[in-house]
Amino acid sequence: LEVAQSTFVLDQPQGLDTPVAQGGTNFSGGQRQRLAIARALMKHADLYIFDDSFSALDFKTDAALRHALQGETCDAAVLIIAQRISTILHADQIVVLKDGEIVGLGTHDELMETCEVYRAIAESQMKGGE
């Protein structure tokens, strides 16, 4: 729970025994995402796929969670699918897709130099406060 920034569960009246309503409606979107990540980490897998798993998190929680995940997933491959540049900023390799086609491959710095699509997204998000 701690790695996934999900200690809010312990503050629930029933703690870890708190029932999850159909569709998780008794938790916020960010809380549901953190619970899903905590469940995934319980398996100690060789591969983790996080498909837009950080989108409902505020930037501070997103950064703290990604930092904590580094230690927890150091012996595994991690694939993060994201629209928010800050979520993938420090990835070893970023694949940029446009209309289902790969239009860029590299690190953030490399893509800022070589990939117009990536650069446009990054600049747009920086202007928007992300």
Which sequence ranges carry the predicted segments?
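Conserved "ABC signature" C-loop
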Residues: 1-19, 44, 60, 117-120
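C-terminal portion of ABC ATPase nucleotide-binding domains
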Residues: 13-15, 60, 67, 71, ...
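Hydrophobic/aromatic position at a conserved helix-loop-beta junction
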Residues: 35, 40-43
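A short, proline-enriched helix->beta-strand linker immediately N-terminal to the Walker B motif
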Residues: 42-46, 75
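Catalytic Walker B motif of ABC-type/P-loop ATPase nucleotide-binding domains
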Residues: 48-52
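ABC ATPase nucleotide-binding domain "signature" loop
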Residues: 55-57
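Conserved H-loop
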Residues: 75-83
